[in-house]
UniProtKB/Swiss-Prot annotation:
Domain of life: Archaea
Organism: Methanocaldococcus jannaschii (strain ATCC 43067 / DSM 2661 / JAL-1 / JCM 10045 / NBRC 100440) (Methanococcus jannaschii)
Xref: Pfam families: PIN_3
InterPro entries: PIN-like_dom_sf, PIN_dom, PIN_toxin-like
Official protein name in the record: Uncharacterized protein MJ1680
NCBIfam families recorded: putative toxin-antitoxin system toxin component, PIN family
Length: 155
């Protein structure tokens, strides 16, 4: 009899969650990044999300917190290697900040949870923390909400 593989939760983490995880690895965003690197959850991303993360991480403002360029590039490469990179066919325009639409596009295509601390994305969700687009309900928790639910899920 074949062994059943555990279903892994699919997530899309926004740029701020990634950066917060690097600045404070022991914080809640750090726990989320650990879950991704330990392959306990599956991160979905896109070339445009990776480009934004790289651009922000390599900015002079953040390099003083994150270390030298070589270290940052190694982390970004490792993150890319444990993520599923897709090129979404959808192009929603529902966010006040147009740059945030790329997270919705990836989550919609991959049926993933968007983990975010971004006020614009959070403002789009209903009282149950879902964003409804074309009859698809995308869960949009904050990092804290996600960790609380994940810990209940695995216990």
């Amino acid at each position: 009899m074949e062994k059943m593989e555990k279903i892994k939760i699919k997530v899309v983490i926004d740029t701020n969650v990634f950066i917060s995880a690097l600045i404070n690895p022991n914080g809640i965003p750090g726990k989320i990044l650990d879950l991704i690197f330990e392959e306990k959850i599956v991160n979905y991303t896109s070339p445009s999300i990776l480009k934004e993360i790289g651009f922000k991480c390599l900015s002079p403002k953040l390099r003083k917190y994150l270390g030298n360029e070589n270290r940052i590039l190694k982390i970004l490469t490792a993150f890319s290697s444990v993520s599923v990179i897709i090129n979404p066919n959808t192009n929603f325009n529902v966010c006040r900040d147009e740059d945030d639409n790329k997270f919705i596009n990836v989550a919609y295509e991959s049926k993933a949870i968007i983990i975010t601390g971004d006020k614009d994305l959070i403002s789009l969700r209903d009282e149950n923390k879902y964003l409804k687009i074309n009859n698809i309900h995308l869960k949009v928790p904050t990092p804290k909400e996600f960790i609380e639910e994940f810990e209940k899920f695995i216990s």
